[in-house]
């Protein structure tokens, strides 16, 4: 502590008081942030239970409050509400915006959803390059749907240079995904049964038995 600073603190005690109060203010701020996060998580869990029970009207306001507090899962599910018109008037632009907020927090489901919005033109203009960008992020975060879609992008050369080897690699990751691989396999087999020629190619590249 310099002599000048020491003299100033004697002449102006408010300086010293400020220094003493600063750690307390930081502690209170930290506590407030933690409490807000806990409240958001509690709201999300309540909302998810209602959402899963298809009580969208009651789920929506809780999801919105949690989403506004920055809860990434709530932001994603709020996007679903807006996209599908669940508990609120359908609004694809709002859906895209909320998916984007969640995706920015590295939430794989939201990253996939943003990619799908760019692929299908949901709430934004179609942009296959952007779709690939977000599918890649979600695929690298082990999202099976994104791995499957990324494989299709490489297979068809949509938004990226066609590459059969990379397509096969992503299809294999999708069908071997620990969480959702079985669902992807079921999807491929269903499409093959319906006579989808692309699905037959995907089945072969993924190494899935008929």
How would you name each of these model-derived features?
Residues 50, 68-71, 84-86, 91, ...:
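Short helix-capping/linker turns of helical repeat alpha-solenoids
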Residues 40, 176-210:
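Terminal, low-structured helical/coil segments at or just beyond the last alpha-helical repeat
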Residues 42-50, 62, 77-84, 113-120, ...:
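Hydrophobic face of amphipathic alpha-helices that form TPR/SEL1-like repeat modules
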Residues 40, 72-74, 108-110, 144-146, ...:
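Helix-start (N-cap) detector for alpha-helical repeat units in TPR-like alpha-solenoids
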Residues 1-20:
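N-terminal secretory signal peptides that target proteins for export/translocation
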């Amino acid at each position: 502590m310099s002599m000048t600073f020491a003299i100033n603190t004697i002449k102006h005690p408010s300086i010293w008081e400020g220094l003493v109060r600063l750690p307390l203010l930081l502690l209170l701020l930290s506590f407030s942030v933690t409490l807000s996060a806990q409240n958001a998580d509690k709201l999300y869990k309540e909302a998810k239970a209602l959402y899963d029970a298809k009580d969208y009207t009651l789920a929506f306001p809780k999801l919105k409050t949690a989403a506004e507090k920055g809860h990434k899962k709530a932001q994603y599910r709020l996007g679903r509400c807006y996209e599908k018109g669940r508990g609120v008037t359908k609004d694809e632009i709002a859906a895209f915006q909320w998916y984007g907020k969640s995706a920015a927090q590295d939430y794989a489901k939201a990253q996939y959803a943003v990619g799908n919005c760019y692929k299908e033109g949901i709430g934004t203009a179609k942009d296959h390059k952007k779709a690939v960008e977000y599918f890649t992020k979600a695929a690298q975060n082990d999202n099976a749907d994104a791995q499957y879609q990324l494989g299709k992008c490489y297979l068809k050369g949509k938004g990226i240079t066609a590459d059969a080897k990379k397509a096969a690699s992503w299809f294999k990751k999708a069908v071997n995904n620990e969480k959702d691989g079985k669902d992807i396999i079921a999807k491929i087999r269903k499409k093959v049964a319906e006579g989808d020629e692309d699905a037959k190619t995907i089945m072969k590249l993924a190494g899935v038995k008929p």
